[in-house]
């Protein structure tokens, strides 16, 4: 099965890329700087460019069956949330045009969801901290989600809390639409969960809160 990954050179993206390769997926990825892929560069097809360029998006997703995106606003440099909304609109347009249904995007546990979600102290704290240090990030991720909800894609918006290298007690990932059971998650476990969503139908058109099990 061939998939595309947008944002494969970052902290989470590299882990997803490596694990997907280990599981036998063929991968094409869109990167601004292929050298950031390190030794993985020679194991994937890559398109050199930016997600805001329609032609590069079309080249990246041509012939794939699913797309994973970790692209999002950096914590310290998100000055224009509309930029990320526009990027999401372009992604949706290209995928719908090429009839690629499955799309998995990474959001965050601090973002607003459904009316029945439970706001624990830990989750409220996450949101308050982001409002103070990176309010444009919250706005950008909310705008991305608004675009997704209006699309015809079989999307899943994965909402993790703090992503850590640290290994936690317990096992795997707990995913829930209403509850965030912890404020941290191991990056390897998160990557496993995201890759599982490529073929899973459990969370289509949903936005699970995910945390360490």
Residue ranges and their predicted role:
Residues 84-85, 139-140, 158, 182-195, ...:
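Substrate-positioning beta->alpha
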Residues 145-166:
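Conserved beta-loop-beta element that borders a ligand/cofactor-binding pocket
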Residues 155, 200-213:
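Core catalytic loop region at the nicotinamide-binding pocket of NAD(P)H-dependent oxidoreductases
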Residues 167-172, 197-206:
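Glycine/proline-rich active-site loop of Rossmann-fold NAD(P)-dependent oxidoreductases
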Residues 3-23:
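N-terminal Rossmann NAD(P)H-binding glycine-rich loop of SDR-like oxidoreductase domains
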Residues 34, 90-136, 144:
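Conserved Rossmann-fold NAD(P)-dependent oxidoreductase catalytic core, especially the SDR/UDP-sugar
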Residues 4, 35-90, 94-97, 198-199:
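NAD(P)H-binding glycine-rich loop region in Rossmannoid oxidoreductase-like domains
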Residues 31, 107, 159-162:
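Conserved SDR Rossmann-fold cofactor-binding beta-strand/turn motif
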């Amino acid at each position: 099965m061939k998939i595309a990954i947008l944002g494969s050179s970052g902290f989470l993206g590299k882990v997803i890329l490596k694990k997907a390769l280990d599981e036998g997926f063929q991968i094409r990825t869109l990167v601004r700087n292929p050298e950031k892929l390190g030794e993985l560069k020679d194991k994937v097809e890559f398109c050199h460019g930016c997600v805001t360029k329609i032609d590069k998006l079309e080249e990246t997703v041509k012939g794939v069956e699913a797309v994973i995106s970790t692209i999002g606003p950096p914590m310290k440099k998100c000055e224009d949330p509309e930029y990320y909304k526009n990027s999401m609109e372009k992604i949706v347009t290209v995928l719908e045009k090429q009839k690629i249904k499955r799309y998995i995007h990474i959001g965050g546990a601090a973002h607003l969801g459904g009316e029945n979600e439970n706001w624990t102290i830990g989750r409220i704290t996450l949101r308050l901290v982001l409002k103070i240090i990176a309010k444009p990030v919250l706005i950008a991720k909310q705008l991305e989600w608004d675009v997704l909800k209006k699309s015809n894609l079989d999307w899943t918006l994965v909402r993790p809390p703090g992503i850590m290298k640290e290994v936690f007690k317990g096992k795997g990932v707990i995913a829930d639409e209403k509850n965030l059971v912890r404020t941290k998650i191991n990056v390897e476990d998160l990557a496993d969960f995201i890759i599982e969503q490529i073929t899973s139908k459990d969370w289509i058109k949903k936005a699970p809160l995910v945390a360490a099990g």
